[in-house]
Regions:
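Conserved catalytic cores of very large enzyme subunits
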Residues: 1-288
């Protein structure tokens, strides 16, 4: 719960210092599950000292208390995001990414699966509004990754996919990403494919390799925002003429570039301590 509480405070602070959406991954909370497990195990050992309790029974007690902690932690994220208001008077536009493939080892993957399961279960239930009716909250938005160990009956994490599908049928979340297609389509200059969350609600960053490390970077990556081309409007404006379509398309692209440059120039000369959580502590960059 403390890790989840701090996560929601960071979410609120970041949202209050910008207008766009933001994304977090449950993988970044997974390491704290084992921290809680060890703390609870120490408490149980102290409580059971001198009693004739088997190691198996102690493990059962630890896991039950751990599940209860995870339940409270996930509930903290869901309810705080719904009830928090940013300084802009809005709920934070937050996306929660659920990708088992991000886990660094088998234990972390199993712990991540517990968090994902609890997150989906709570979203399926919904939250109560002022009238006490269970409703579907707009945020956090959920994204679930389909991968090799959760798409076939009999796969170790297939139960999560079944739970996600049940939740989608009722709550219209989570959305889904195919790991297989992402690895095919999002290939960096090193020739490696990557699966990662979108930036906020919908915009996917292009593959990028940090020149300082030679490694891909997607989290905490400075991005000034997105400009969208309305292709339907371009098509209608062309009147069915292909040459005119491409001419208008090129003009709109140039306008997009101008819009992005306007944002860039607006930020030139701004000291990083104008919004430390964004520029100095990693929400967007780690500048000095």
């Amino acid at each position: 719960p403390p890790a989840c509480n701090i996560a929601t405070q960071i979410i609120a602070q970041v949202a209050s210092n910008q207008y766009g959406g933001q994304s977090i991954s449950l993988t970044h909370l997974a390491p704290f599950v084992d921290v809680s497990r060890k703390k609870i195990a120490a408490e149980v050992e102290a409580e059971m000292e001198g009693l004739d309790v088997s190691a198996e029974r102690k493990r059962e007690i630890v896991e039950r208390r751990l599940r209860s902690e995870i339940n409270r932690g996930v509930q903290t994220i869901q309810y705080q995001v719904v009830t928090l208001m940013t300084t802009n008077g809005q709920a934070p536009f937050i996306t929660v990414f659920m990708y088992l493939g991000e886990a660094r080892n088998a234990q972390e993957k199993a712990d991540l699966a517990i968090i994902i399961e609890e997150t989906i279960r709570q979203r399926y239930q919904g939250v109560k509004n002022e009238a006490g009716v269970w409703i579907t909250p707009a945020f956090p938005k959920l994204i679930y990754v389909l991968e090799e160990d959760n798409i076939h009956p009999g796969d170790p994490y297939y139960y999560l996919t079944e739970l996600a599908a049940k939740c989608t049928a009722k709550r219209m979340v989570p959305d889904y990403i195919s790991e297989k297609k992402m690895l095919e389509l999002k290939v960096d200059k090193n020739g490696e494919g990557h699966c990662y969350t979108c930036m906020g609600c919908r915009s996917f960053l292009t593959p990028y390799v940090d020149p300082e490390t030679g490694k891909p970077k997607y989290y905490g990556r400075f991005n000034q925002g997105v400009v969208t081309i309305n292709l339907v409007d371009v098509a209608l404006s062309s009147g069915g003429n292909f040459d005119k379509f491409w001419k208008i398309f090129d003009e709109r692209l140039a306008l997009c570039h101008r819009a992005l440059q306007a944002r860039h120039k607006r930020l030139l000369g701004t000291p990083s301590d104008a919004a430390p959580i964004l520029w100095q502590y990693g929400a967007l960059a780690r500048l000095k």
